[in-house]
């Protein structure tokens, strides 16, 4: 039989759980509201967002008049606009979603842990935007120029072969590249967090550099379309970020050593 004391302990432990679940529900609802509002806003301007995403193709062919995209069934362009709206909503609502996650986690962190967490919260979207910019200004223009350059003009002995991307396939391509670059550009954040947790150190990263090169190219081959241009466009910046991560981890180790020396001096 359970005693009154044990029942009180069960009730006391149950109360914090209910409070956490209530808080989680509140944060999820706020994040969902932000996403839905951004979705409708982006859907209203989906045409303009898509036109902006198509600009690397426009640059490759020379002018908007020469850029032709097609869709092969009636609702394809509508579904593409819905995808554009969802893509834009996720991008624009991310600061709100990240803040809700932070506000849910922050009460369980010490003050110094909260201060340490904030730079990563800021660095994550910044690095993602840099990755997306690399896609928009470097990878996609190179890929589009290469694709347009493969066209064949009609002659007396050969047919005309034109590059006519589908609206859905173009969107899928640029979204895949943006997500691939955005995720890979989080490498400094991930490795620095692992260093703070004591799982890796700068010497480990230096020793495994040759293996990192192989892994990066394999990941680039998996995440990008099967063409050499986009694979190299992803692999090269990621390797540079790996080197930057070594510097970041070295700084973490230096600060940790200084903090330990200060504590030892106080003792």
Regions found by a protein language model. Name each.
Residues 1-267:
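Membrane topogenic/interface segments and analogous intrinsically disordered interaction regions
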């Amino acid at each position: 039989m359970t005693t009154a004391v044990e029942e009180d302990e069960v009730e006391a432990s149950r109360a914090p759980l209910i409070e956490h679940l209530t808080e989680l529900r509140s944060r999820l609802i706020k994040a969902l509201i932000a996403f839905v509002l951004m979705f409708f806003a982006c859907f209203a301007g989906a045409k303009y967002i898509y036109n902006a995403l198509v600009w690397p193709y426009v640059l490759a062919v020379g002018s908007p008049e020469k850029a032709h995209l097609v869709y092969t069934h009636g609702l394809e362009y509508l579904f593409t606009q819905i995808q554009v709206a969802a893509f834009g909503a996720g991008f624009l609502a991310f600061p709100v979603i990240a803040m809700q996650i932070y506000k849910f986690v922050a009460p369980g962190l010490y003050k110094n842990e909260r201060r340490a967490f904030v730079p990563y919260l800021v660095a994550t979207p910044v690095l993602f935007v840099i990755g997306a910019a690399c896609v928009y200004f470097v990878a996609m223009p190179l890929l589009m120029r290469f694709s347009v350059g493969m066209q064949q003009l009609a002659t007396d002995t050969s047919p005309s072969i034109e590059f006519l991307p589908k609206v859905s396939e173009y969107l899928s391509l640029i979204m895949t590249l943006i997500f691939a670059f955005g995720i890979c550009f989080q490498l400094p954040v991930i490795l620095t967090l692992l260093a703070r947790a004591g799982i890796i150190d700068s010497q480990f990263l230096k020793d495994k550099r040759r293996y990192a090169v192989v892994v990066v190219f394999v990941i680039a081959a998996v995440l990008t379309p099967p063409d050499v241009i986009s694979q190299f466009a992803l692999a090269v910046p990621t390797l540079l970020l790996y080197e930057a991560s070594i510097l970041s981890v070295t700084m973490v180790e230096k600060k940790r050593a200084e903090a330990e020396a200060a504590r030892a001096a106080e003792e």
